Amino acid sequence: MTLFRLALKGLTALVLALAPQFAAAEDEAPPSEAVTLGFIENIVVGNLGMKMTAKLDTGADTSSVHAYNVKVYQRGERDNWVKFRLIGKDGRAIRYDQNVIRFAQIKTKSGGLIRRPVIRLPLCVGGQWGRAEINLADRGDFEYEILIGREFLANRVLVDSGRTFIAAEECEQPDED
């Protein structure tokens, strides 16, 4: 086999090997509707318009909020529900009583596991409304009471980790839950 044919075969193999990576990169391009926001932003939680300051964290799968007086109980034979309170930036507290959609197992720094209830709540950041799966946690030791993870951010928000409070759009109240 000539050197030219050997080089051509090698080049063909390289192109075929890289083709799926280029195709995958095209599939992962952000949608044109995604808005760029800072890693810290003001958000609106729930339909009652509670304002909180959130950390937008692309390293977290799901969102987490500092909830007070969390009490899980059963309604019926198998339905888990949870009562809790959230406190906004203005000090206003809102009580919730919601269906638990699942329980998350969270690893602690010491290597143990904590079981947290996960609920769905409407959130808005930078004018982008959506429902987020949020685990109820004790975030008292953290600077921000709510952390927004990839599950909510995907296809809505691009996070600029070097900037804060850059949202241009305000969050108008939703018409429904």
How does the language model describe each region?
Residues 1-11:
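Bacterial N-terminal signal peptides that target proteins for export
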Residues 24-177:
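Pepsin/retropepsin-fold aspartyl endopeptidases
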